[in-house]
Amino acid sequence: MAIYGIGTDIVQLSRIAAVLERTGGRFAEKVLGPDELRVFHARRARSEARGIAFLATRFSAKEAFSKAIGLGMHWPMTWRALQTLNQRSGEPYVVASGELADWLAARGITARVTVSDERDYAVSFVVAETDAPPPAPAPVPRTLP
């Protein structure tokens, strides 16, 4: 496997809370996939702070993933096309759907994700890998003294 790209993102939890309040909850529905949305509602019902932290880590993971694959938030990378779920062990993993899944499969891209949150911030890091041979590196221009 070769590294296709890496991405990282950090978001302030208060920013996510403010957007969620301003949109009456629609922000979560816009950003989260169906499985993520179920977890968000369950966590938020138990603790508003844990719900906000979950939403922030998932938002951050999508941003980091979009950077790792080199597209930013442009088709086929859409908010709901990528979900970050958790194994029983707690390990996060990404699941792509629709046209994003097709785009990734055509390029042999898989990804690993890690997320974390603390009192004020959520952070994510994504490593996208491919089984395709990496392109030759661009020559480095030499400068004369």
UniProtKB/Swiss-Prot annotation:
It catalyses: apo-[ACP] + CoA = holo-[ACP] + adenosine 3',5'-bisphosphate + H(+). Its EC number is 2.7.8.7. Its cofactor is Mg(2+). It is found in: Cytoplasm. Its main location: cytoplasm. Keywords: Cytoplasm, Fatty acid biosynthesis, Fatty acid metabolism, Lipid biosynthesis, Lipid metabolism, Magnesium, Metal-binding, Transferase. It comes from the Bacteria. GO terms for cellular component: cytoplasm. Coiled coil: none annotated. GO terms for molecular function: holo-[acyl-carrier-protein] synthase activity; magnesium ion binding. It holds the Pfam family ACPS. Mg(2+) binds at residues 9, 63. GO terms for biological process: fatty acid biosynthetic process. InterPro entries: 4-PPantetheinyl_Trfase_dom, 4-PPantetheinyl_Trfase_dom_sf, ACPS, Ppantetheine-prot_Trfase_dom. Belongs to the P-Pant transferase superfamily. AcpS family. Transfers the 4'-phosphopantetheine moiety from coenzyme A to a Ser of acyl-carrier-protein. HAMAP family: AcpS. This is Holo-[acyl-carrier-protein] synthase. It comes from Burkholderia vietnamiensis (strain G4 / LMG 22486).
